[in-house]
Each structure stands twice: as C-alpha cells, then as structure tokens.
C-alpha cells in the first residue's frame, strides 16, 4: 500500500475570543499558512492536487471557505478545494480524507488542515426570511448553537462534561488541578520557545501605524493556581463543577500540513516529517460525547498494528478537564507522555482547526527518542477521531 507522509506542518498562534484575530477571517488565517508552506517547501503551487480544510462556523464567510483560503494563499485556480465539518474533529478528518485520496491513487499532494474564527461567528435571526407578523423575535448565536450545543439533547457541551463528572466521580479539585497543570506546561513550553518551530506569525494591518505581528498563543496564563480556579462559578450547571477555568476556551486560529505520497516526496526531494500509520473514528451516546476518544484510539491503534505501549507521545484535545480525566482513566495513559506542552485548556480550542493543531504540535515533538505519536479529539454529537503517526525513516 502507498505510504502517506506529512512533509510540512504549521499553525498560527491561537487567539482568544475577541482578541488579536477578531477582525481576521478564518480563511485569511488559513491562507497565511498555505502561503508559508509553499514558500518553505519550494513546491510549485500547480502541483498540489487538492486542498481540504476543516471549518465549522461557516455562516457569513462566503461559498466554500477552503476555496477562499486556497486562492488567497496563492494557489492557482486550477487547484480544487472543499470544506469539511466534523465539528471538533474537522481538521483531523480533513487530513484523513487527504490520506485516503492518496492511498486510492486519486491524489499525490494535498494541503489539508483546519481553520476557525469563533470571534467572527454571526448572530442569526431564524425564520425571518419571509418576515414576522407580530411579537418579539430573538437572535441565535451561531457559535453556541452550531458549534457548542448538543443538538440531540439541546444543551451545551459543558453539560456532557458534567455528565462524565457524575459517571466517573470526578471532583472539582481534580479538574482544577488538571487545568493548572495544562497551563503550567504551556507556560514552560512558551517561555522555552518550544512552539516556535510550529507557529507562523500573523501580521495584522492597523488603521494607523505599523501592522501588529502576533507570534504567541494568547490564552496561556501564568500564575494560575488551584486556589484561584476554585473561586470560579460553575459555567453550565448550578451545582456543577465545570468552569471557564477547567474547560477549553473560545478561540481563533488555523493549522495546516502538506500530505503527500512517499514516492512524490522522493521525486521532489522533499524530506517528510512523519508517516501516517492509521486513523480511527468512534461514536457514543451524545450525552457523554467526551468519552468517545477511547473507542477511536483503540481503532486507530488496531489499524496501525500498534499497542498503547508503543506510543511515545500523546496529543489529546482538552475540551474539558473532566472529559480528559475520564479518557485517561479508561485508557490508563502515562501522564508524562500526554500533552507535554500543555493542551487546549491553556492553548485554546478553535473548533475547526483543533484537529490539525494537535497533530502539528505532535509532529514537532518527533525525534530519535520520540518516534511514535497518537492524537485524538472528542466531537460534539457523540463522536471522536484519532490518528497514529511515526517519525519518517
């Protein structure tokens, strides 16, 4: 079978809600990375067979945001593109679709990843197309409804985390401690420049003066403590334990990579970073969607012909501390190998981009000692996706 390799992998910094990227459309963040990958690899843009990009909150951006990103990123109009929505798994699903298209011989080179600007998601006035006869009407927050609400139970994703708290007996202190650890690891990695190789700075024009260059993730917080987090009120349930401090944020960002057949990489003298070994997807009861990575990880390992003990590093999306703790309990993961640079609680969770972001961060950790990695994300609606990669040899 054709070996599929990852030949370049980058991401933007992750902006906080209403932060540095609030006026930068998702497709511009994606275009920045496409342009950078073409320049970095020296690849002829016309040799790219397809562009596949995850993007969840598409309303108001225009037709097919992936196509917009591709064209604005400098690709010729002959290169097709399409947009993927698998909620939080969109970015990783895009990479899986690229992988599948190469294995089947349809493509040789694909740009794949994810992008999201949650700050720019619009408010909607449903059923207003043909007017209202009388009475008050309300607006729907497209970010909350299309991105963060379990449509089957009509409640926020945070309630699914509270359901896992009850099922697994997870305490508030455990969640806050997990969140503090995530922040501390991210602070350390940021201060040591460990994200520098994976981040492409984004220049933001200003009405007056020089452009602002965004180089670092905005959500990383120093001086976070369990004591400080314990003062926060429950965010989703009156007597709950899930708070803004032990959950991922609302964020903006993008991540992208060059997916190729090994033969094409050799032909073009492009040195790959890693080999895609296999993927797994799984579904569970939507009310406990956060536990779905367990099944996805098991399937990805089986398809990759690997055991959990073969994995040197894990990048698992931290939708909620409670969700992450539940998955850890089921899989019995070695904590020293999981999210060693911090996770989404600290770095952020731009939903359409996160699937690609966790893989980008994982790829930049591979070396002679860390040869195999696994990444996974839970997905609203009761799903999860996972992937296994190995350092290219």
Curated annotation (Swiss-Prot):
The active site is at residues 88, 349, 378. GO terms for cellular component: cytoplasm. It is found in: Cytoplasm. InterPro entries: Thiolase, Thiolase-like, Thiolase_acyl_enz_int_AS, Thiolase_AS, Thiolase_C, Thiolase_CS, Thiolase_N. Pfam families: Thiolase_C, Thiolase_N. NCBIfam families: AcCoA-C-Actrans. This is Probable acetyl-CoA acyltransferase. It comes from Staphylococcus aureus (strain MSSA476).
